[in-house]
């Protein structure tokens, strides 16, 4: 399995390289998460990451292969009465592209905790993640 500490540190490093990101937060379902999200100021552009899920397959015990579903979000908190959702999508598109380039670039170093299991990556617009947020999700499979 992917070590959560290494996974968190990877996203923190990615966030440090992209100045328009104001924070990096793990998405958990608890009261603290709700407080953190509602406490973010308007205009905050956050890299949210989900702890990865794991699926394993194999014909034999010695040929067991792990794949981890990884999902991150680049979301901006905005005031829907002052800004259109499409404007937020436009302004965050370059940021999600930079996150994608960091993921792909990290594969060259050989020590990334998220080695790509395949080159299938999905990026989708997100407008209902939380009220007052819009942006993009990025999903991919990583090797264990």
Regions found by a protein language model. Name each.
Residues 1-63:
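Small/polar-rich, solvent-exposed N-terminal microdomains that initiate assembly or binding
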Residues 11-22, 45, 90-143:
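Acidic-leaning, charged glycine-interspersed low-complexity segments
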Residues 1, 5, 86, 90, ...:
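Charge-dense, low-complexity intrinsically disordered segments
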Residues 64-79, 132-144:
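Oligomerization/assembly interface segments of phage tail-like spikes and tubes
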Residues 63-67, 75-101:
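Extracellular/virion structural assembly segments
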Residues 48-50, 68, 75-79, 116-120:
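Alpha-helical context
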């Amino acid at each position: 399995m992917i070590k959560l500490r290494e996974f968190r540190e990877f996203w923190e490093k990615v966030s440090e390289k992209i100045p328009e990101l104001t924070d990096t937060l793990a998405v958990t379902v608890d009261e603290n998460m709700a407080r953190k999200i509602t406490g973010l100021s308007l205009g905050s552009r956050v890299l949210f990451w989900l702890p990865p899920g794991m699926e394993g397959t194999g014909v034999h015990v010695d040929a067991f292969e792990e794949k981890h579903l990884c999902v991150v979000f680049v979301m901006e908190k905005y005031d829907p009465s002052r800004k259109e959702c499409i404007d937020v999508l436009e302004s965050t598109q370059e940021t999600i592209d930079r996150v994608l380039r960091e993921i792909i670039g990290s594969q060259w170093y050989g020590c990334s905790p998220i080695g790509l299991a395949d080159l299938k990556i999905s990026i989708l617009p997100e407008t209902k993640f939380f009220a007052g947020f819009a942006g993009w999700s990025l999903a991919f499979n990583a090797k264990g």
